[in-house]
Amino acid sequence: MRAFKWALAIGATLALPLTAQAQTGGAERLAALLESVTSYSADFDQQILDGGGQRLQEAEGHMWLSRPGKFHWEVEAPYRQVVVSDGDKVYLYDPDLEQVSVRPLDTRVTHTPALLLSGSADALTENYAVESRQGDDEETFTLTPKSPDTLFESLQLTFENERLEGLQMEDSTGQRTAIAFDDIEVNGDIDASRFTFEIPEGADVIREGG
């Protein structure tokens, strides 16, 4: 099951007390955390769970983000998949199928976790209802999309000491995608070539949306 690339575009936090800043304050705090990040790279471990908590799929890889609008998300195991945004187009590459899907970086694609993290934080209050929860060194933000044209029903971002450590998203069926980040580097130098994609010779190209 190759659900990862379509999921893009991702327990204890639910028990944390809800802060008084549930809407505008939570959005402003999250925007401030995201605006302080110009680039972000990390290893990741992803698990997809069904509504009962049964693990359906696990994957691992590396990701790079550069704001605004650029990212490179690469699954290394159990099989390689690559998703790259150059700020104008999004490329989804499946080496096993020798297939590349190319689509514009439009509103629909922006409503995904990767583009949310790499895009403009100012759009948060317009597009999402935001609630915040706080622990000792941990902050968790729950985002509920205001538009139905999204890939998730809710998205949780978890920060520890003001650094993004993980995210969890849930779709309309109750299926959850949980992503934990490790070996994190914030605002480091990332080679610009990470955010370019050259279509491999002989690959089948599917262009969507112009």
Curated annotation (Swiss-Prot):
Chief place of localization: periplasm
Cellular component terms (Gene Ontology): outer membrane-bounded periplasmic space
Protein's cellular compartments: Periplasm
Extent of the signal sequence: 1-22
Disulfide bonds: none
A GO biological process held by the record: lipoprotein localization to outer membrane
A Pfam entry, by short name: LolA
Keywords: Chaperone, Periplasm, Protein transport, Signal, Transport
Role of this protein: Participates in the translocation of lipoproteins from the inner membrane to the outer membrane. Only forms a complex with a lipoprotein if the residue after the N-terminal Cys is not an aspartate (The Asp acts as a targeting signal to indicate that the lipoprotein should stay in the inner membrane).
Family assignment from sequence similarity: Belongs to the LolA family.
Assembly and binders: Monomer.
UniProt-listed HAMAP family: LolA
PANTHER family found in the cross-reference section: OUTER-MEMBRANE LIPOPROTEIN CARRIER PROTEIN
Protein name, UniProt field: Outer-membrane lipoprotein carrier protein
